[in-house]
């Protein structure tokens, strides 16, 4: 029997499908629904990013090939001051103002306490609060994670939302292939 409300194949002037048609159709539909759900990048407006005791280190262009080393140095710096990292790594990208904006990249980590004596290159805020952000939640292969930022840029364009150019990417969880990432983009 066909599904309720379905049109018989013969009504379209073609031969009826094999006996298993409704079952195969349902399987394909369910698989497609799962693929769609797993590949969805959720977007929301007017979200607030709040980080406490956040330690930041600016990354120079010459250091981009050594990001793993920089993260290890940050963790060692935190531990050497009797503090502990709290939560995931955050990457912040800001653009300089002027006729030729240049990206500035920062690695950030929240720590369990303020560090009293900072070495050159490090900055710390007791509370970093960024209100009114566009937000995207990405789950999937990390080599596609840039799609979250791209989707927010498209969303901002379609909804006439002005962005400042500052974005925070929070690497919530990740293994060798897949991961979870939250992206906050600052709005004007």
Describe each region flagged by the PLM.
Residues 29-32:
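Polybasic, lysine-rich low-complexity intrinsically disordered segments
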Residues 3-5:
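Glycine-biased, low-complexity coil/linker segments
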Residues 34-188:
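A solvent-exposed interaction/effector surface
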């Amino acid at each position: 029997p066909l599904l309720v409300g379905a049109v018989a194949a013969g009504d379209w002037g073609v031969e009826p499908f094999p006996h298993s048609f409704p079952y195969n159709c349902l399987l394909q539909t369910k698989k497609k629904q799962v693929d769609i759900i797993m590949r969805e990048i959720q977007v929301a407006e007017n979200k607030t990013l709040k980080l406490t005791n956040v330690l930041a280190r600016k990354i120079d262009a010459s250091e981009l090939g050594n990001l793993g080393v920089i993260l290890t140095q940050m963790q060692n710096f935190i531990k050497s001051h009797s503090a502990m990292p709290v939560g995931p790594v955050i990457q912040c990208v800001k653009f300089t103002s002027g006729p030729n904006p240049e990206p500035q990249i920062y690695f950030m980590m929240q720590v369990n306490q303020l560090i009293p004596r900072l070495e050159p290159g490090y900055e710390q805020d007791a509370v970093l609060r960024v209100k009114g952000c566009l937000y995207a939640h990405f789950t999937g292969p990390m080599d596609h994670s840039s799609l979250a930022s791209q989707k927010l840029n498209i969303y901002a364009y379609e909804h006439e939302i002005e962005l400042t150019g500052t974005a925070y990417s929070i690497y919530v969880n990740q293994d060798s292939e897949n991961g979870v990432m939250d992206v906050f983009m600052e709005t004007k």
